[in-house]
Amino acid sequence: MVIIMETQKLKIRDIITVTLLTLINIVIFFASSLLYLNPITVLLMPVIYGLVEGVVYFAIGTKVKKRGAMLIYCVLRGILGGYLPYIICYVLAGFVAEFIMAKTGYGSVKGLTLSYVIIELLAALGGTFYPYVIAADSFFRDAAALVESGEMNIHVVDAAEILRSWVSVALVAAIVVASFVGALIAGKIMKKHLSGMNKSV
């Protein structure tokens, strides 16, 4: 029992692995600034994240099958997002992910899929739905001045207007579907990668 518990503890190399892998998704996050082309691409950003970020998440889940790995991933993602509601939602997502993985088993595809979908939803809540819908009045109070000064993209303002309608429900559904598809793709990639490693050994 002691041996099992010891193997479940994160080591320095595990933390480094999680951090380096997380940086890949953080680069994707910052590169997404290229998507501020129009209001539609702005709204599609969390959908695109759901499709492409799963590979890194599953890589962490299959390489570091230990308690705390998913929490570290979420904390790093949240903090480097630099927006308090986004940070809070990501940290909450990290605890939810850890709970799910503890129940399903670390490395479980089912657990990774479920936790990934929830993480992407909570990330969208903190980064898109909260500022654009829930706190829109305060977030866009000085929108005109910010747009004029270049501190805010006009497409963000237009996207928020669109989102404050039935589109918000459609976006939630799209994020769930995209995240699930992203998880399926990631699962297949990881399965192929691991089987390839086993053959080479």
Regions found by a protein language model. Give the residues of each.
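Hydrophobic transmembrane alpha-helices
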Residues: 2, 6-72
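Alpha-helical transmembrane segments and their cytosolic interface
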Residues: 2-20, 24, 31, 158-201
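Hydrophobic alpha-helical transmembrane segments
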Residues: 15-19, 47-48, 70-72, 87-92, ...
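Aromatic-anchored segments of alpha-helical transmembrane domains
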Residues: 22-30, 75-84, 119-128
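Short helix-perturbing small/polar motifs within transmembrane alpha-helices
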Residues: 27, 91-128, 183
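Membrane-interfacial segments
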Residues: 32-40, 64, 68, 100, ...
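Interfacial aromatic-anchored transmembrane helix boundaries in multi-pass membrane proteins
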Residues: 34-38, 42, 75-100
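Membrane-embedded alpha-helical hairpins and interfacial helices in multi-pass inner-membrane proteins
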Residues: 87, 115-191
